């Protein structure tokens, strides 16, 4: 089965996002339990398409792409802060816009 792919801009460069669990074939050193991977030198992001983790994994790997100097712990902290903030974001603003809500 072919993986779904999209192209997104990051830092004025085109990055390919591949929705499949990363494997050793994709990048040497991938661990079996990895659900995402950012390969900066190839401008590729791999994201396991599992519905329970796809959004957080996508966000996590994009943070790695945008801020390659950050440690894994810092990326996790950023990911959690952003997801928590969006969890509290008023749904009516998302659906109707600020002026209509």
Language-model features: where?
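Active-site recognition of the HExxH zinc-binding catalytic motif
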Residues: 56-68
